[in-house]
UniProtKB/Swiss-Prot annotation:
Location within or outside the cell: Cytoplasm, Cytoskeleton, Microtubule organizing center, Centrosome; Cytoplasm, Cytoskeleton, Spindle pole
SUPFAM superfamilies: C-terminal domain of adenylylcyclase associated protein
Family per similarity comment: Belongs to the TBCC family.
Signal peptide stretch: none
Any Gene Ontology biological process: regulation of cell shape
Protein name according to UniProt: TBCC domain-containing protein 1
Major localisation: cytoplasm
Cellular component terms per the entry's GO annotation: cytoplasm; spindle pole centrosome
Length: 557
């Protein structure tokens, strides 16, 4: 088969979920990663290759790269969360951790974890995606970019937004521009010069090409099936092009790189393709007096399970509520949604909320990462594997999470609070995403960026300000209470408030008011309640629950 009919593309998930949205440690440069690659490959008997154990990575990261132990674990755990584990395996790991009585016991359990060594090296290298380039900053927009100055178009085909994690053009360009470095990182130390470079005669092992399948996949001709890179590279008709030798069982570095470059193309399941030719969803309605129309698109009708995307933008002044197969297992991006109440009550793969204001987001369990960037006055309610935030102001996070929330750069007035709601299918959805109620680190965030070393950037919600959140929709299912319950201090605050209400009701009852007095009192209470609804913004939420006119009803997902 003609090699021009082979199409390769860069996978989205390693970048959407795996690339931490913060400049990487300086020790993750190619120079140090090459040294690590050589170090681990010559220590195969010491838990370093082909599987890298946590204890070995901890030794390398803390002892040689001078990283803090928490940061070393963070990168190790993020990569591990990308691995193909069943929900049952993830729940089993949560149970193991929840039974640990000390940090020493936790560390003992972590020491049993291992990851694919070569893939982990690639994972560390792609952290360079979010490296700050001084040259780009000088010739492009100011960095940091003034938030109120941003007038970038909303989710256009070639989005110029700064979120490279969702930009498949950035993914493709990154791999194409650094392909030689990526291949050299995977070479056997014997194939490198003294300065850690390849030669024209360098050979690439099958294991290295298997590892590169972490980033690249593809298809042949018009076949609908997707293949990992190594299966295509090892396919008999392509040996001459990919440079594979049956005798040495290796690839020619030069031929392999040339073949990869000639076949790399855009991701047919990426954000750009989704926005250009994806299915448009009529989930939102047009609000009177606004010119911008909500844009919601998905590729779930054509994409395989791990490639599903849902992108929504410009939902404005309304309630949008969905529990849909379209959302199940999808990577979701929510962009420029303002003054809205958005409920996505399905098990989700990942969620990114970007440039949203004055809104509430209630999400089904998020199996990997929930990330917020450049949001103001937003409340997020979710069970998620990981929460990370950057450039947020005045946001509140009611979360249940087995990992420490990550506070990245540029945040102000962050509030964390316990998860405080439920819907009938919640526990079923948690089981499907492998999320348990313990351990729960909602109140122990990790400040990742040095500028935020001052812990005052966040606070825990005072119990006196805590209320449970009621999801105002009927669904089938068995969950009838908040999974895992509430922390005792918050449960106590609710009990005290309920007691005050009962005392007040008793006082009114024993006042023996006349009929006219009762009527006057009722009007007074209703007026005060109405004022409270307006002052708190709850009036808008109640109004938005009223279904729109028949002609603009939200479509079923």
């Amino acid at each position: 088969m003609d090699q021009s009919r082979v199409l390769l593309w860069v996978k989205a998930e390693p970048f959407i979920v795996g690339a931490l949205q913060v400049p990487p440690p300086s020790k993750f440069s190619l120079h140090y990663l090459r040294k690590i690659s050589t170090y681990v490959q010559i220590r195969a008997t010491e838990g370093a290759y082909p599987r890298l154990y946590w204890s070995t990575w901890r030794h390398i990261a803390c002892g040689k790269l001078q990283l803090a132990k928490d940061l070393a674990w963070l990168y190790f755990e993020i990569f591990d969360s990308l691995s193909m584990k069943t929900p049952e395996e993830r729940l089993e790991w949560s149970e193991v951790l929840s039974n640990c009585m000390s940090e020493e016991e936790v560390e003992k359990q972590r020491n049993q974890l291992s990851v694919d060594t070569l893939q982990f090296l690639l994972f560390l290298y792609i952290q360079q995606l979010n490296k700050v380039s001084l040259r780009t900053s000088l010739i492009g927009e100011e960095w940091p970019s003034p938030r109120n100055k941003s007038q970038s178009p909303d989710l256009t085909e070639k989005s110029n937004c700064h979120n490279k994690n969702w930009n498949d053009y950035s993914h493709q360009a990154f791999v194409y521009d650094h392909l030689s470095d990526l291949l050299e990182l995977l070479l056997d130390p014997k194939q490198l010069t003294a300065s850690f470079h390849s030669t024209h005669s360098s050979l690439v092992s099958r294991e290295a090409v298997v590892a590169l399948s972490f980033l690249i996949e593809g298809t042949i001709s018009r076949a609908r099936k997707i293949y990992p890179l190594h299966e295509l590279a090892l396919w008999q008709p392509l040996h001459a092009d990919s440079g594979f030798s049956k005798i040495s069982k290796t690839f020619s570095f030069y031929k392999l790189e040339t073949w990869l470059r000639s076949c790399l193309t855009g991701n047919p399941f990426g954000t750009s393709a989704c926005l250009k030719s994806g299915k448009k969803l009529a989930w939102a309605h047009q609000v009177e007096g606004t010119t911008k129309r909500a844009k919601i698109a998905c590729n779930t009708h054509v994409a395989p399970r791990m490639h599903r995307l849902v992108v929504m933008s410009q939902v404005y002044k309304q309630t949008l509520a969905k529990s849909s197969d379209t959302l199940a297992g999808a990577h979701v991006k929510i962009h420029r949604c303002n003054e809205s109440f958005i409920y996505l009550l399905s098990p989700l793969r990942s969620v990114t909320i970007e440039k949203c204001r004055n809104s509430i987001f209630v999400l089904g369990p998020v199996g990997t990462t929930l990330h917020l960037h450049s949001c103001d006055n937003v409340k997020v309610i979710a069970v998620c594997h990981r929460l990370s935030i950057s450039s947020t102001t005045g946001c509140i996070f009611h979360v249940l999470t087995p990992t420490r929330p990550l506070i990245l750069s540029g945040n102000q007035t962050v509030t964390f609070a316990p998860f405080h709601t439920h819907y009938p299918m919640l526990e079923d959805h948690m089981a499907r995403t492998g999320l348990a109620t313990v351990p729960n680190y909602w109140d122990n965030p990790m400040v990742v960026c040095r500028e935020n070393s001052d812990t005052r950037v966040f606070q825990l919600l005072p119990p006196c300000e805590f209320y449970v959140f009621i999801i105002p929709f009927e669904m089938e299912g068995d969950t009838t209470e908040i999974p895992g319950g509430l922390p005792s201090v918050y449960q106590k605050a609710l009990g005290q408030r309920e007691q005050k209400i009962q005392i007040w009701q008793k006082t009114v009852k024993e006042a023996h008011l006349t009929k006219d007095q009762r009527k006057q009192f009722q009007v007074l209470v209703e007026n005060k309640f109405y004022e409270w609804l307006i002052n708190t913004g709850h009036r808008q939420q109640l109004d938005s629950l009223v279904p729109p006119a028949a002609g603009s009803k939200q479509a079923a997902g």
